[in-house]
Design a protein with these regions (language model features):
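Conserved glycine-rich Rossmann-like NAD(P)H-binding loop of the short-chain dehydrogenase/reductase
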Residues: 30-37
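Mid/C-terminal beta-alpha module of Rossmann-like enzyme folds, strongest
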Residues: 200-261, 275-314
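N-terminal Rossmann NAD(P)H-binding glycine-rich loop of SDR-like oxidoreductase domains
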Residues: 8-28
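NAD(P)H-binding glycine-rich loop region in Rossmannoid oxidoreductase-like domains
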Residues: 40-99, 103, 121-126
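Conserved Rossmann-fold NAD(P)-dependent oxidoreductase catalytic core, especially the SDR/UDP-sugar
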Residues: 81-82, 91-152, 156
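Extended, low-polarity transmembrane helix blocks
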Residues: 262-337, 352-367, 373-431
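A conserved pocket-lining segment of Rossmann-fold NAD(P)-dependent short-chain dehydrogenase/reductase
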Residues: 168-189, 193, 197-201, 205, ...
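Alpha-helical membrane-targeting segments
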Residues: 164-187, 229-273, 339
Length: 431
């Protein structure tokens, strides 16, 4: 480690940009403390970790951070939430970082403390909660000697969130959807180039807000076409989606908590994401590469193609299963008893118990449907769904085994339903 380097705290280290920063700075010789809400995977990756939920009131206090920052000389704040409540957004972007910066300034000599805040391009022209709190976060950072670095669209070897959505749109079957006319400008920057810029700016800080983007400007259509070619897929017609339809999809995404499928993301795609590299970025010893250069720097693997094709299956599976549970619940609540009691005749189960079982099961099914549509604890809910399907299957196998022999499948259909639930469980783990 050179004399100029030191120990760096990375906030949001389990995110797409945060992980690239953690690995890149560690490879460059920095001692990295990776901080995130859940640190188990970062622990397994060999990082020193600091578990902290920036949305909690506790993390907004200087006392929480003091004593946890022993030896830390620099901070890189890569934490951010695109869609969240007003309270959570302000806590993550403003209050918790302010406490971190203040605590860091109290640990040793203030003049040796340097840091970078990864911010976002375009927030000056937007009045979304995300943009407002980003601007507030930048003001707090500047007041503590932390340099905001506004990044344009960030792509990388891996993908998450918006970059995953871009790959999914590029790999869409039969057509390639774009928002509006598809002529919006982008100058993507590679995550590895962003990491190199951050490493340099930590030891060569610049004054004021900086911006970083790639040197090549492409339209939305050109960017998705480039990603499609990289994935090895043939050309397809471009489907220009009306903006009103995209906004409606964004509202559905917000309601279902689908991350990058959100109103905020749609607004960004409507306008494009164009960074104007600042003087400090133009003076970097190693300039960022253009989109065409880095997208063709390595071949796409099977995992890239599979991920791109499966990414949009997550909302599809949620909606399909929600419809299944909704219909099942309504049937359980309102199906006349004369329709289902004959199926268990002779089983020894009292009619009142069978009716209660059907009605309570209907309520449970509707609750599961609601949880799916709201995106409430999706992975645990997948376990609940599997348990319910298995429970129904075992119960009906005992009470009415003839259901296995019905011409249209009967209980046999539960087997593919279990497979769909298992697939949803896998897809809900984005990290």
């Amino acid at each position: 480690m050179t004399e100029a380097q030191g120990k760096v705290l990375i906030l949001g280290a389990d995110g797409f940009i945060g992980r690239h920063l953690a690995f890149g700075l560690r490879a460059a010789g920095w001692e990295v403390v990776a901080s995130a809400r859940r640190c188990a995977r970062l622990d397994r990756m060999g990082f020193e970790t600091l578990e902290a939920d920036l949305a909690s009131p506790e993390s907004a206090t200087v006392a929480f951070w003091q004593g946890r920052l022993e030896g830390v000389t620099h901070v890189v704040n890569a934490a951010g939430v695109l869609t969240a409540s007003e309270r959570v957004s302000q806590a993550v972007h403003v209050q918790a970082p302010a406490a971190v910066y203040e605590a860091l300034g109290k640990t040793g000599q203030r003049e040796t403390r340097r840091g970078v805040l990864i911010s976002a391009v375009g927030i000056d022209d937007s009045e979304t909660g995300f943009a407002r709190h980003r601007r507030e976060g930048e003001a707090v950072a500047l007041a503590h000697g932390i340099m905001p670095l506004r990044a344009g669209l960030v792509l990388g070897e891996t993908s998450y969130g918006g970059s995953s959505l871009a790959r999914a749109l590029a790999a869409f079957p039969f057509v390639m959807p774009v928002v509006g006319a598809g002529e919006q400008p982008f100058n993507p920057v590679h995550a590895a180039d962003l990491t190199k810029a951050v490493a340099h700016l930590l030891t060569h800080p610049a004054e004021g807000v900086q911006e970083i983007g790639g040197p090549e400007v492409v339209t939305q259509t050109e960017m998705l076409t480039g990603l499609r070619r990289w994935l090895g897929l043939g050309p397809v017609p471009v489907l220009r989606l009306p903006v009103w339809l995209c906004r409606a999809m964004g509202r559905i995404g917000d309601a279902m908590r689908l991350g990058p499928i959100s109103v905020t993301a749609v607004r960004q795609l409507e306008a494009g994401v164009l960074a104007e590299p600042s003087e400090a970025v133009r003076a970097l010893p190693e300039r960022p590469r253009g989109f065409s250069d880095f997208v063709n720097a390595r071949p796409a693997g099977t995992q890239d193609l599979w991920h791109a094709r499966l990414y949009l299956m997550r909302p599809v599976l949620r909606i399909v299963l929600a419809v299944l549970w909704s219909v099942s619940g309504l049937i359980g609540l309102f199906l006349p008893t004369a329709e289902f009691l004959p199926l268990i005749a002779g089983s020894g189960v009292p009619d009142w118990l069978a009716i209660a079982f059907a009605r309570l099961g209907g309520v449970a099914d509707l609750l599961i449907a609601g949880a799916l549509l709201r995106g409430w604890r999706p992975r645990p809910m997948a376990g609940v769904q599997a348990a319910m399907v298995l429970g129904y299957t075992v119960a009906f196998s005992v009470l009415a085994p003839v259901l296995w022999l019905l011409p249209l499948g009967g209980l046999l259909k539960n087997l593919p339903v279990l497979a769909l639930i298992a697939l949803l469980y896998i897809l809900e783990d984005e990290r």
